[in-house]
Amino acid sequence: MRQKKNDKSSEGRLTNVSGDLLVRRFSVRQPEMFRVVEMVLAKKLTSIDKAALCELAQTAMDIEFDGLDGDFLQAGCGLGGAAIVIAHAKRRSRVFTVHDLSASELAAHGADERLNVQFVPGPYEETLALDGALALVHLDCGEYGPMRVLLERLAPRLVSGGHLIVDDYRTKEECRKAVDDYFRGKKGFQLIRKSRLHVIRN
């Protein structure tokens, strides 16, 4: 396991920049997606800040640009804001599954079968598949036990270059401990602290 700052850079990508600068650049380079981000915030569909949402959208778009194999997956969606952003950032052909108890806002904002989004109701600890490649995973879970289950089932499925994003790593101690315990001593993963923690498969 290695922790380092992200030093990857290429045209169109937003790396190594402050939150405000990231938002400004994203709004210019990706105006359509930026409007989705602003809509989600205006409707109060997420507690995630604007910079983190822009970073999430850019990560999904970078994965599409790189042509990585694998599905997108989110576990825990709250009011659905982050899932809506991911759904609009990805290509329509990419399968995106959302695991949570309910997700009433997703379909209302186009994040349904029209964008190849599949909602899987129920406790995600019980509904997650144990196989299948994943290119992007977004985890919104603050408790130790459920987070360990998510990591054990999902991290091994990441493709090379895939991202597992942990929303609550900085703010919730149980989440942080679960992540640190799981990845301690594990090879093949980079832990990069951006606005959220990104775990990238080598």
PLM regions with names:
Residues 53-68:
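Conserved alpha-helix/loop element of class I SAM-dependent methyltransferases that forms part
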Residues 1-23:
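N-terminal auxiliary segments of SAM/dcSAM-dependent transferases
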Residues 19, 23-47, 66-202:
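S-adenosylmethionine/decaboxylated-SAM
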Residues 11, 50-53, 155:
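Generic N-terminal initiation segments characterized by hydrophobic and/or small/turn-forming residues
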Residues 49, 53-56, 83:
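Short alpha-helical patches at coil-to-helix transitions and adjacent helical residues
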